[in-house]
A protein has these predicted regions:
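Transmembrane-helix signature of 12-pass secondary carriers
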Residues: 1-221
Length: 221
């Protein structure tokens, strides 16, 4: 849901941001692509946190990061601050999706996990619908009261996921499969960061990571 919401949110806000900061076409497009630059490392790091400490902590952390990034975007004074915050949001979204996918699939009964996966993917559509409605009604109203502030108000709606994260932290149990694997001592063996950066090829892997990140920056910006 957050993925779909953010993708449409930045698309709706972009024309107003372009005008507010006098951006070029390339700069405007980079605000969308920024979230894709940091996604791969977000999935890696937050996925490793989910493997080591649990799916629920990884989900809660990623949602808080998304909310922080979104709220901070509303207060961004210039293009570069906004670009960096978009990197934070992309990092968080990848972690949120990987953690929530693992949580849902590991928590549902085995005979229903295909349905669980489909249910999870449908959240993207609901996020798109939610963003469209917020832009249609809330942003229009804010712009009518304070012209030019509508796009900032759109990002401020990022405070809503904080409520969800607090609810999840207090009420949701840990994924059953992860808890079982942890009891058996399998959690550490499956830690993605340890697999990639703790073996004999760790230096090569570090180099590949840097090259990949620089390559994505060049391509998308």
């Amino acid at each position: 849901l957050l993925d779909g919401y953010d993708f449409v949110l930045i698309s709706f806000a972009l024309p107003a941001i372009k005008e507010a900061f006098s951006l070029t076409l390339v700069q405007s497009a980079s605000l969308i692509s920024a979230a894709f630059i940091s996604r791969w490392i977000g999935g890696l790091v937050l996925g490793a946190i989910g493997d080591r400490y649990g799916r629920k902590p990884a989900m809660v952390l990623s949602i808080f990061m998304f909310a922080f990034g979104s709220i901070a975007c509303a207060l961004a004074p210039n293009f570069w601050i906004l670009f960096i915050l978009r990197l934070v949001i992309g990092f968080a979204m990848a972690g949120e999706y990987s953690a929530s996918a693992a949580y849902v699939i590991e928590s549902w009964p085995k005979h229903m996990r295909n349905k669980a996966s489909g249910f999870l993917l449908s959240g993207y559509a609901f996020g798109v619908i939610a963003a469209a409605q917020v832009d249609k009604y809330f942003v229009t109203w804010v712009d009518s009261v304070h012209p030019g502030w509508g796009w900032r108000a759109l990002f401020l709606t990022g405070i809503v996921p904080i409520v969800v994260a607090i609810y999840m932290r207090r009420t949701l149990p840990e994924a059953a499969d992860w808890s079982e694997a942890k009891e058996k001592g399998d959690g550490e063996k499956n830690d993605m960061l340890a697999v990639l950066f703790g073996g004999q090829r760790k230096i090569l892997n570090y180099i590949v990571v840097v090259i990949a990140f620089v390559g994505l920056m060049v391509i998308f910006t």
